[in-house]
Amino acid sequence: MKQPQKKSAGKRIGMTLLVIAVVLLALFLFYTENYYHADRTAVMSLRTDDHAVVTSSWNGVMFDGPGTEDLLIFYPGGKVEETAYAPLLRQLAEEGLDVFLVRMPCRLAVFGVNKAAEALEEVDDYDHVYIGGHSLGGAMAANYAAKHPEEMDGVILLAAYSTKALPEDLPVLSVYGTEDGVLNRGKYEENLANVPDLQEVVIEGGNHACFGSYGEQAGDGEARIDPERQWDKTAEAILTFLQH
């Protein structure tokens, strides 16, 4: 006689779990879809011209300039539209460093740590391959490099730090701005031990968001230089790093 009550209780539990799952999914989608969009300057940087060929695929965007030897695989920051980094990455390509900008699941690099492997399958062979990224993207790029150091000639971190220990013979470039209000400086300092071969460049007046072109970011400091100046300084630091 108690069988129907047990079945009814089981149905209620099942329905409760289903409702919870739907609510959690809705919250997750709301979180991931509330992201920073590439602005007009970034969109304009996606055009192909005599200086760089820009092509898009399921995995990301390729910036192919006159260089043929060096490639940077770039992971975008969390909840940032990947094409927001087009101005900086295009500038690098025009100056000899081709760049593959990875398209991340839900715009969160934590869900695409191994995307570099797919990028390497898609592009031509290069003599030197580097991996890097901005903020969360930089941290996840460093994680990939820690697991596959033999694939990389260096790591480039923009307002980011490595939570994994990197080999002593793997050079790392760290670039951040003095006005960055998002980068956790305490965590940054704590994790310096993970990057024994470190070159650090501090951009005076630069902030967190101006590595890309997506407007102001919550919690960030106010930049004292314009984005173009920060891109120039960043490109200069990266290209100098490659020479050494």
Model-derived features: positions:
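Gly/Ala-rich beta-loop-alpha elbow adjacent to hydrolase catalytic centers
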Residues: 133-141
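C-terminal catalytic-base region of ester-bond hydrolases, centering on the histidine
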Residues: 190-244
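Short beta-strand/loop motif that positions the catalytic acidic residue
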Residues: 174-176
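Short beta-strand element of the alpha/beta-hydrolase
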Residues: 69-77
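Conserved alpha/beta-hydrolase
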Residues: 89-109
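Hydrophobic membrane-insertion alpha-helices, especially the h-region
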Residues: 12-31
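Short alpha-helix in the alpha/beta-hydrolase fold that links the catalytic acid
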Residues: 88, 183-194
